[in-house]
Every structure is written in structure tokens, then in C-alpha cells.
């Protein structure tokens, strides 16, 4: 149980803005800090999935700036690397002007880094005295694995350079997650879950009341007053705001704010609508967060497989837990939902992610409704196996290995002029 608690504490962290551009800003801020001055030349080398997820999303606190160059520029002039995923929380209007000036001067060059892990960012910054700093992030959004200045090593983390991103999560299983959620002392996780509920609800509120994205959440909320539609709307609304540059922080899951919101809001809606007590909501969130992490460890943090699918499926499992406390139904919910939603591709972070979240949450709820009515998909139907752990692994295998070429084609299609 201690390991599950530590896992949650390491994953459910606060982030301001979409995590891929924020990760670039973090690397850029670190490069400037080590260099000791504003660079006169910057080269940004990114894996394909980073480029894909930064291309169409608004960088927070920039008045609408988008793209790798924008994230690099604002991180360089205004970032504070000590703040991690809140690196851009102190941006001023003057900083935005300076970042735009940097973009106008065309000193930032972006290139695709091939043959690397899906989450790989390297920034090489040079000043007017030809001092050079190299900063590299790998595997997780805040993991700076290498810093050099004039080829002298300042920092290197060999462990994170070579360690698979989910190596320490091997003990995860749906059964053990269920036992943990049932029995853990809630005092160990109460503050963590309260932050998740409070922050993710706040950005969802903003998505429903402000002018963000295509207003997917608002539209769903206005169309239908059912609990199902409210769950979809509240999750989508948070993404409406986040993908369009809202600076409110969120609690993430598996490195993703959208996934953190998707894990949170459907359960908050069901708890409010059905008057569940706080303990029931907390334990349901433990199921959802850990199931999402469990599914994602086989898929990878970034891939061609849309990440909110796993979060929507996990939300269905959490709702099932709150309503039934039944392990068999939770396993069937996950299996059913994966058969409904698997296959949705990731074509980058952008406003339409809100609609994908609504689709994923709908699949999670459908999976649960099928399970509670004893109408389940059977083993042999597509990727569904006899055992839920085998099913999760089969989905992960298709997503991580089978969709590699899909990922390449999606990226090339997106960057075609």
C-alpha cells in the first residue's frame, strides 16, 4: 500500500498549462539560467510526439501564443526552472513582449529528433560570446537528465537516461488497486485528492463560464441535463479552458492535465448528483487514478493512442466502484470500455481534445452500464481477453508497438505545409 501511495504522490502533481509546451519551457529556462544570459541562438530538438502535442495548443500566460518556438521563447525570457511544471507562473506583459521580439528575430530553430523515446527534448542555447549550454529532458516532463556548459557536464542522471518510465509500477493490477482503495488510510492521501478535486473543478468551472475553445463542455451541459451528460460536460469543459491557454493549474495524471481532469470530473459529478460522502469519492478517485496509470504504463506517456481513452475508461471504473464496490463489475467495466473507445488516435494537443474527452468519458460510463446490466463483451471479441490484465496488456501492445507507423504518418501529415 505504501508503494501505491508514493506512486500517487509522484504522479498527481500540479501543472500550469499543457505539459508538453511546459516541458519545453522548462528546458529553455534551465538553459538560460545555466548560460547566465539571454541566448542569441537556440536550437530545439524534439521527438515527434512532443512536436505533435505542442503544435496546436496555446502556451499559458502568453496571450495566445502557440508552438514549439513560442514555448521556447517564453521559457527562455521568463521561466523559472525551480518551479517545475509551474515554470511559467510568473510571466509578465513585458516578458511576453520580449518573447515575441525573440520570435521576430528568428533565433530559434526547431528540428525533429529521430530514433529516440517519445518524450525527448533537447535545447542547445548559445550566447554572443559563443558559450553553449545543452539541456535534455527524457521520459517524464520534468526529468532533466543532462545539463552541460561548453561541453562540461553540470548535471547528468544516468538512471533516468536508461530506466523505462514505468519500471517501478510492475506491481499494479486491478485487483490490488481495488484492495488498496478499499483499505488505505485516507489520511495518507486526503490532501492529494482534495487538491485534485478543487483545482480540476475550478478549471472545469472556468471552461463552463469563460470563452474557451469550442465550448464543448458548455454545449453538452446545455443540450442534456442527465448525469451522464453532466459528467462528460464537466470533463470536457476543463479541457476547453486548458487547451486554449487558461493559466489555472490542474492536478495531472500520467503526465497529462487532460487525463487528470478526465479522471476527476466524472466522479465529482456522480458524487454530487447522488450525494455520496467524501470517503466514497476519495476511494473512487483512487481507483480511477491508479487504473489510468496502470493502463498508461503499457501504452507509454506519449503515443499515437489518445491518452484520454485510458482516463475515460478509468473514470468508468471509479464510478462503478462508488456505486457497487464490486471488483468483478469494475473489471468488466474496464474491459467493456476499452472495447468501445480503443483506437482513437492522438493528433496532438489542441481544442478538439475536449470532444475526445467527452467521447472517452461516455465510453467509460457505457462500459459500466453494460457491466451492471450483465451485458458484457466476451473474450475473443476484438482485443478482449479472458483476464482483465491480459486485456490491458493487449491494448498497450497495440498502442505502443502496433501504432508506431501511425504515429509517424500522423506527425508528417500534421506538419505538411
Swiss-Prot record:
Taxonomically, which superkingdom? Answer: Bacteria
Q: Which GO terms describe its biological process?
A: L-cysteine catabolic process to pyruvate
Mind listing the GO molecular function terms for this protein?
Answer: L-cysteine desulfhydrase activity
The UniProt family comment states: Belongs to the UPF0597 family.
How is this protein named in the record? Answer: UPF0597 protein FMG_0209
Originating organism: Finegoldia magna (strain ATCC 29328 / DSM 20472 / WAL 2508) (Peptostreptococcus magnus)
Amino acid at each position: 500500500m505504501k508503494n501505491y501511495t508514493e506512486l500517487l504522490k509522484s504522479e498527481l502533481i500540479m501543472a500550469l498549462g499543457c505539459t508538453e509546451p511546459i516541458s519545453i519551457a522548462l528546458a529553455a529556462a534551465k538553459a538560460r539560467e545555466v548560460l547566465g544570459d539571454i541566448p542569441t541562438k537556440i536550437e530545439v530538438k524534439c521527438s515527434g510526439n512532443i512536436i505533435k502535442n505542442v503544435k496546436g495548443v496555446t502556451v499559458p500566460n502568453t496571450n495566445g501564443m502557440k508552438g514549439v518556438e513560442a514555448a521556447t521563447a517564453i521559457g527562455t525570457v521568463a521561466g523559472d526552472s525551480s518551479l517545475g511544471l509551474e515554470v511559467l507562473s510568473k510571466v509578465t506583459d513585458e516578458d511576453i513582449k520580449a518573447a515575441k521580439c525573440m520570435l521576430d528575430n528568428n533565433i530559434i530553430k526547431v528540428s525533429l529528433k529521430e530514433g529516440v523515446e517519445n518524450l525527448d527534448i533537447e535545447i542547445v542555447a548559445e550566447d554572443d560570446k559563443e558559450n553553449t549550454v545543452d539541456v535534455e529532458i527524457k521520459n517524464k516532463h520534468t526529468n532533466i537528465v543532462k545539463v552541460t556548459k561548453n561541453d562540461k557536464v553540470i548535471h547528468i542522471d544516468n538512471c533516468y537516461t536508461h530506466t523505462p518510465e514505468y519500471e517501478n509500477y510492475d506491481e499494479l493490477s486491478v485487483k490490488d488497486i481495488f484492495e488498496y482503495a478499499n483499505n488505505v488510510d485516507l489520511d495518507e492521501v486526503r490532501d492529494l485528492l482534495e487538491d485534485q478535486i478543487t483545482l480540476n473543478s475550478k478549471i472545469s468551472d472556468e471552461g463552463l463560464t469563460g470563452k474557451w475553445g469550442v465550448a464543448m463542455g458548455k454545449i453538452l451541459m446545455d443540450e442534456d441535463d442527465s448525469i451522464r451528460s453532466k459528467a462528460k460536460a464537466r470533463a470536457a469543459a476543463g479541457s476547453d479552458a486548458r487547451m486554449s491557454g487558461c493559466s489555472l493549474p490542474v492536478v495531472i495524471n500520467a503526465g497529462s492535465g487532460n487525463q487528470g481532469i478526465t479522471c476527476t470530473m466524472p466522479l465529482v459529478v456522480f458524487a454530487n448528483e447522488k450525494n455520496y460522502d467524501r470517503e466514497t469519492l476519495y476511494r473512487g478517485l483512487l481507483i480511477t487514478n491508479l487504473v489510468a496509470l496502470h493502463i498508461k504504463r503499457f501504452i507509454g506517456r506519449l503515443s499515437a493512442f489518445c491518452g484520454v481513452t485510458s482516463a475515460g475508461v478509468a473514470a468508468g471504473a471509479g464510478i462503478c466502484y462508488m456505486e457497487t464496490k464490486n471488483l468483478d463489475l469494475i473489471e468488466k467495466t474496464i474491459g467493456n470500455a476499452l472495447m468501445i473507445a480503443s483506437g482513437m488516435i492522438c493528433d496532438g494537443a489542441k481544442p478538439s481534445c475536449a470532444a475526445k474527452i467527452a467521447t472517452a468519458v461516455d465510453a467509460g460510463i457505457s462500459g459500466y452500464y453494460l457491466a451492471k446490466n450483465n451485458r458484457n463483451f466476451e473474450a475473443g471479441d476484438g482485443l478482449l481477453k479472458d483476464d482483465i490484465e491480459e486485456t490491458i496488456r493487449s491494448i498497450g501492445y497495440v498502442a505502443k508497438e502496433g501504432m508506431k507507423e501511425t504515429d509517424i504518418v500522423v506527425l508528417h501529415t500534421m506538419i505538411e505545409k
